Amino acid sequence: MTTMAEGTGAPARRVAWVTGASRGVGRGIASALGAAGWAVYVTARSSAAGRTGHLPGTVEEAAAAVSAAGGQGAGIVCDHADDAAVAAVARRIRAEQGRLDLLVNNVWGGYERINAGLWEESRLPLWEQPLEVFDAMFTRGVRAHYVALAVCAPMLISTPASLVVTVSNAVSAGGDGGAYAMAKLADDRLALTAALQLKEHKVASVAVHPGWVRTEGVMQFAEYIDLSQSQSPEGVGRAVAALAGDPDVLSLTGQALAVDALAARYGIDVTT
C-alpha cells in the first residue's frame, strides 16, 4: 500500500482501519471506502491460512475487494483479544501512512455458537445461556473497541478532521437482548465518552446502528427473521463512507446514528 495514487501525483488517500472486516458489515464498510478511494487496512482472524469457523471470508479477500473497488487495501491477520497485536497494527499504519482519518470499530465476538447452528440457544433467558457468550461479546467486542481506540487516539488526534465509528445496535436503547444489549449499550457509551474527550482535538466519534443486515451469518437463519426491510453490508458501508466524507461530521459527534437515518441524510440506498 502506498500513500499516493500511482503515477498521478494526486494527494495522499485518506486512510481507514476497519476491524473485523473479513466478512459481513466490516467487509461492506471496507469495500465502500475503497469505492470512495480510501486506503483501507482490514483486520480479522480469518485468513487464507485458516478461518475461525465455517463462514466464508478472509482478510486477504476483503483487502482485494477494497483495491478492486478503486481504493488500496491491506489485509492484516489480527486477533483483537491480543492487545500487543492490535498495537502492532496501529504502529504499522503510522509507519506506512503517518495518519489515520477513520477508525471503524466493528470487530465482534459472541456469535460463534450461533454460527455453529445454535440459533435457538440465543433466544434463551440470560441465566440459561452459556457464560462464554457474555465473555466473547465483551472481550472481542466492547474491550476490543476500547483497545483499538486507545492505541489509535494519538494518530487520530494528529490527523485533521478524523472520525471514530463504533458499530453498535439500537437494541441498546431498551427491550430484551441479554448480553448482546448490554454490550451494545457499552459500545454506545464508549462512542459518547470518546466524543466528549476528543472533541477539543476536532476528532468526531459516533455510534452507528445498522438494522437487520444480510450478512453471511444472518442469512443462515433467514427463515427465522423478517428481512423485508433489511440492509446489505455494502449499503451499510455506503452510509459509513458518506458519513466519513461529511465536512460537518463534528456536529454529529456523540450521537448514535441509525443507518436508515444516514441513508436519508445523504440520499443513498442501503438496501442493495
Language-model-derived ranges and their functions:
Residues L149-A150, L192:
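A short, exposed helix-loop element centered on a Lys and neighboring polar residues
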Residues P11-A12, A69-Q72, R92-N105, G110-E112:
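A glycine-rich helix->loop->beta "capping" turn
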Residues T8-S47:
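Canonical Rossmann dinucleotide-binding motif of NAD(H)/NADP(H)-dependent dehydrogenases/reductases
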Residues P56-G57, V77-A90, L131:
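The beta1-alpha1 cofactor-binding region of Rossmann-like NAD(H)/NADP(H)-dependent oxidoreductases
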Residues A207, E223-T272:
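C-terminal helical subdomain
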Residues G109-A116, E120-V133, M137-F138, I157-E200, ...:
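Catalytic loop of short-chain dehydrogenase/reductase
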Residues R13-R14, G71-Q72, R99-L100, M155-N169, ...:
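Active-site loop of short-chain dehydrogenase/reductase
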